Amino acid sequence: MSGTMEILIREMTMEDYGQVYDLWTEIKGFGIRSLDDSKEGVERFLKRNPATSVVAVQNGHVVGNILCGHDGRTGCFYHVCVAPGYRKHGIGYRMVRAAMEALQKGA
């Protein structure tokens, strides 16, 4: 990772799904469930939990992701991941903060 490149943390959209799925498969030992993690499954998840899932993006490329949802009382983080070459730069921390802020706003 270049130190001069900025990482944008923003809400995940379905347009990100392909890159997010590729990131999941890139990470050794990352568990993917065929039903929940399918395009249709993630689309349902994002509709139930708008604004709480985030991506980290560098130059249009997804380098991190958190799927985050809630049931009205309890928030839960799923699939917290950062691409191996981008770790130890605070990206995960920034994504967690963004998702927590969305949960606190009652998203």
Give the ranges of each region predicted by the language model:
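Short, intrinsically disordered, charge-balanced linker/junction segments flanking boundaries
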Residues: 63, 101-107
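Conserved beta-strand in the GNAT
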Residues: 55, 61-69, 76-81
